[in-house]
Amino acid sequence: QELLNDQQNAITFAAARADETVIVKTPKGSKIKCKRKASNKKNSTKDVAQQKLAYPRATYVSTGYSKNNCHAYAWTGRQDIWMQSPVLYVSDGSYKAIKGRPKSNGQIAVWGSYTHSAIVTNYGTQDPTVTSKWGGGHIWRCGASYCPYNGPICYYGR
């Protein structure tokens, strides 16, 4: 009986900690499947100094979560999910491409074929300032061209 209770408790605990699918909606109502990982946890700040050495012109903003990425952070503001691709925000017409530079804060910068997303936080600087989640790491602010991602940068707005 005791062994059975331990097994049931283990199964209950595992079920409570399972990954789950979360649906987020674009402003036009398109549904995007995201993942909420059971193992999502606040990152240690021990690597911030090392990142700062590698990118001295970037400003550390805040601690990130391990199973959250740039797309979820930039497009939804959430740190509890992982979004594989934000392309529906554009393809359904919720956001439109902006020619040239961003025109206001809060617009979204996208690198290459949606390899990275960031929030424009100062469109008026020569190199527009963006705030973004670097992979599964922390949240940083820097000039868009200074971010550690490659590809042409496109800006999107509502």
Residue ranges and their predicted role:
Residues 13, 17-22, 31-33, 38, ...:
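Active-site or metal-binding loop neighborhoods of secreted/extracellular toxin and effector enzymes
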Residues 9-91:
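N-terminal capping segments
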Residues 83-140:
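...with weaker cross-activation on analogous glycine-rich loops/strands in unrelated enzymes
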Residues 1-9:
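Sec-dependent, cleavable N-terminal signal peptides
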Residues 73-75, 95, 155-156:
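Aromatic side chains
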